[in-house]
Amino acid sequence: MKNAIKLFILIFIVTGCGESKSSSLVAQEADCENLSHYGEIEICLPEIDGMKEAYSYPQVRERSDLFSYDNNTILGLYLSKENYLAIDNFENEALDDYFKVYALKQFEGIEISKLEFEELGEYSKGNFIEKSWEGVIDKVLNGTIDISIGQPVQIETYKPHEDIITTVLLIKMISGVEERIAVCTLNMVRLKNSLIYYAYYKNYTSAKTLEKVKAKNDYFGYKLLGKNN
């Protein structure tokens, strides 16, 4: 299983991006209006205030820069209200503030124990260039931080819940001719004894962006676990 775990890490890194709270915050919720499937497992996609799950739309599914990995099973894509209102022109829309929920086809049907999940977290360390947030915040604010496209900078790894491992990255993204810095979270979730992933992307706009990203990212994870307990 250790070799499989290493492979999990590699694929997770490639397909993800290009305040900690107690696990007691997750409460089981009944009913589900939006089901997705990963093999024989039913995944309930939670409702998130201010966002719309939109992966069922053909124009969303066809956007190549979001879903170009053959080894991914996309379970859902949550758009901000602004992006959802522009869905008719989705292929050309500059996205911000969105979640992608996915799994890996190669490991469909494989059960992951708590111990293996912890090992997965250990193997994930050191896979990115690491810098402290305090060491880069001034450069981010004044636009002088040096980040190459395809080489994100890891600024934090933490566990908002015992079944979620979160890595926070700074990434450079291009929209047309415009370059921008975004905060991306990569999340590995042990859900129904399987591995599910979600990534959150938010353009960096102020010193409070990181705090807001972590809060919204963690909230999404609690809702996802709560709907699938």
Tell where the protein language model's regions lie, with residue ranges.
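Start-of-domain marker
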Residues: 23-74
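Short, surface-exposed beta-strand/loop micro-motifs that present aromatic residues
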Residues: 180-191
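Core RNA-modification/binding signature centered on pseudouridine synthases
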Residues: 174-176, 186, 218-219
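Surface-exposed amphipathic alpha-helical segments
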Residues: 193-229
